[in-house]
């Protein structure tokens, strides 16, 4: 499971180095192969170990190609999906189209979300964190069914 946020750098070739603490987990779940795609709700990228991505693909396969919304959903996720392999130094090349989508340049944030990562431009991540804080503070969490009984 992946957790925590890590400040990382992207090199001039568009590569990021996956932090050491995650590399073993990525190799346990497979051969260090990951799938990178867009997040259709936020301006960031989603990074899945291959076996986790295959579960997503199985769900996508159940969606209809004749329903325009379902087809568009599939097209967005699958059309941007790139299978990538970590090199011997734990680096992965983020394809240019995906870097452009997420506005990635040099400074980035890799955020563990249990079964996947989000990859954000550092400034966009900070703005999203500020927006999330405002949203959470403005809500009565006990009125949210799935959060009502959640306690820390």
Curated annotation (Swiss-Prot):
A Pfam family that the UniProt record links to this protein: MraZ
The keyword DNA-binding is annotated on this UniProt entry: yes
Cellular component, GO annotation: cytoplasm; nucleoid
Subunit details: Forms oligomers.
Native organism: Shewanella denitrificans (strain OS217 / ATCC BAA-1090 / DSM 15013)
Alphabetized CDD domains for the sequence: MraZ_C, MraZ_N
GO process annotations (BP): negative regulation of DNA-templated transcription initiation
Protein name from the UniProt record: Transcriptional regulator MraZ
GO molecular function, a single term: transcription cis-regulatory region binding
Primary site of residence: cytoplasm
NCBIfam families membership: division/cell wall cluster transcriptional repressor MraZ
Subcellular location: Cytoplasm, Nucleoid
Annotated keywords: Cytoplasm, DNA-binding, Repeat, Transcription, Transcription regulation
Residue ranges of domain SpoVT-AbrB in the record: 5-52, 81-124
Keyword set includes NAD: no
Family: Belongs to the MraZ family.
InterPro entries: MraZ (IPR003444), MraZ_C (IPR035644), MraZ_dom (IPR020603), MraZ_N (IPR035642), MraZ_sf (IPR038619), SpoVT-AbrB_dom (IPR007159), SpoVT-AbrB_sf (IPR037914)
Taxonomic superkingdom: Bacteria
């Amino acid at each position: 499971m992946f957790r925590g946020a890590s400040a990382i750098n992207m090199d001039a070739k568009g590569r990021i180095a996956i932090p050491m603490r995650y590399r073993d987990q990525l190799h346990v779940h497979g051969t260090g192969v990951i799938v990178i795609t867009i997040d259709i709700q936020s301006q960031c990228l989603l990074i899945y170990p291959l076996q986790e991505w295959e579960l997503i693909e199985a769900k996508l396969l159940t969606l209809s190609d004749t329903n325009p919304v379902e087809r568009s959903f599939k097209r967005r996720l699958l059309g941007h999906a790139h299978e990538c392999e970590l090199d011997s130094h734990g680096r992965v090349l983020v394809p240019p189209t995906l870097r452009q989508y997420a506005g990635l340049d040099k400074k980035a944030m890799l955020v563990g979300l249990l079964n996947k990562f989000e990859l954000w431009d550092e400034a966009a991540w900070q703005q999203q964190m500020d927006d999330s804080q405002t949203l959470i503070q403005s809500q009565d969490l006990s009125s949210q069914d799935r959060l009502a009984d959640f306690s820390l």
